[in-house]
Regions:
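Short hydrophobic alpha-helices and adjacent helix-cap/hinge residues
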Residues: 2-198
Length: 198
């Protein structure tokens, strides 16, 4: 009978897994991560709208938006939160210790306070790191310019991921007789000026 259809539809909707995807900003590499995640879910039989409901939210670079998005995912009892980039992951971790959180595009998950270790993340959080190996980059740079003596490092000092890479670079430089000249920025409008000063 038609009177039961709404209940059946409601039961079907509530049986779907709810996946919240939070992304700090639109960016080609971050968008690729999101799209790849959704494609892989689909390949594994979890097509959006069938067995799973995917709710993608973009914070547009705003920390307050990040917090609000993650609070919504928690209050609506999502089954898993996918957090793309460190700020998204930190916001999600700050809102729940129960809902599983999977992060991507986080350079230093331990230093960012997301997990206790890479080998055994612990708690409700796991994911992948996109750590850049400063020593490997320097080895390549030295292949191109063998007599390099000074390296410029332009980074955002308030971002733990950036600081981690620069610390690795400084350690490599100290061991290999190189000098690191640092230039820090707080926003993208400062990049050109600080880069010129290096």
């Amino acid at each position: 009978s038609t009177s039961k259809q709404p209940e059946t539809q409601k039961a079907s909707e509530s049986a779907k897994l709810k996946v919240g995807i939070v992304q700090i900003v639109e960016h080609p590499s971050l968008n690729t991560i999101r799209e790849s995640f959704i494609q892989e879910l689909d390949k594994q039989g979890f097509k959006d709208g069938d067995k799973v409901t995917i709710d993608y939210q973009n914070a547009q670079g705003d920390q307050t938006n990040l917090k609000t998005i993650c609070q919504k995912f928690v209050s609506n009892k999502y089954d898993v939160i996918i957090a793309i980039a460190t700020p998204s992951a930190q916001a999600a971790v700050g809102e729940t210790k129960e809902i599983p959180i999977v992060f991507a595009a986080c350079t230093d998950p331990v230093g960012s306070g997301l997990v206790s270790s890479l080998e055994k993340p612990g708690g409700n959080v796991t994911g992948t790191s996109d750590a850049v190996s400063a020593p490997k980059i320097m080895e390549l740079a030295r292949l191109i310019t063998p007599d390099i003596k000074t390296v410029g490092a332009l980074y955002t000092s308030s971002e733990t991921n950036s600081v981690s890479v620069v610390n690795d670079l400084k350690a490599y430089a100290a061991q290999n007789g190189l000098t690191v000249v640092e230039g820090t920025v707080t926003n993208s409008s400062e990049v050109q000026q600080v880069a010129s000063s290096l």
